[in-house]
Amino acid sequence: MKRVFPILILCLSLMSVAKAQVGGERIYSFLNIPTSATQAALGGEALTVKDNVNQPLWNPATISRFMDNQAAVNYVNYLAGINVGSATFAHLINRRFGTLHGGIQYIDYGEFIAADEDGTETGDFGARDLAVSIGYAYNIPWSDFYVGANVKFLSSKIENFTSQGLASDIGIYYYSDYRPYSFTAVIRNLGYQITPYEEQREEIAYDVAVGASYLMKDVPIKWHLTINSLQQWNLAVPNPSNSNTDLDGNTEEESISFLDNMMRHFVIGVELFPEKNFNLRFGYNFRRAAELKLAEARTFAGLSAGFGLKMGRFKFDYAFTKYHPVDNSSTFTLYIDLARKGF
């Protein structure tokens, strides 16, 4: 019985690999929205953040005993008035079995006006997505390698249409207290739509990524690098805002080079004073910057920044993410050490 849970997770993960490609549009893309302030400030996809109870939502291999009785709640004031939230918790079962991690992700798209084919308003409706996850990681004996997996139960509702799905994350992570670097490989959101909105099942938006971090020796700076979307080389989609029109009215699409497309796979983050009670974080998401830039204006899209402040058993994080000149995102996180008494 001691290995039942890890084996169950592995079986579900392999099942989702086999059924990941079904056809149709990709769904449940809300799983790729960063819901923690640490994640958002570091560019939106840092995979090597250590001892952070929110991190296993992105990389289950980072689950560790140091997360025991740690909890976090997160809120994102997302684009266009969309509200995003999540909560996470970890508990050490025992030193032999290891630590279990649980998480909830939620997104509320707000209310929309319903209308018939003639444009006559018939009322309003809402749209919401929910994911509930449970995860586990295992330290490979006599090594500094960790393997982990999440199982996610997914639910979505758009007006009267509902959908349920099952997805999983699989990761491997190298970390040593005696090395300034760490690295990881993760496959996220492999899954299967159990109940479609209508008759045809659709694909879940999965991602294959690798990441690394490096803590500088004489300067209190830690670097994070992520290379994502390895399952799809071509990420370049011409931005209509950057097309050119000549005097004859002919429109020329934005030209995207090999280097431009390659850099869209990269996310860079940096932490200042990463091991102190107060720290600063900055990030740059190359794909976000390329897709949201405007030819006639400096948008600063792709940039993000934030800070963390720890006081006793509590820690507060904030992140600001730049998307567009008219819309930005703020992320708030509160961590609580439930094992610590008093303030």
Model-derived features: where do they sit?
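Sec-dependent N-terminal signal peptides
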Residues: 4-15
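Subset of outer-membrane beta-barrel
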Residues: 21-343
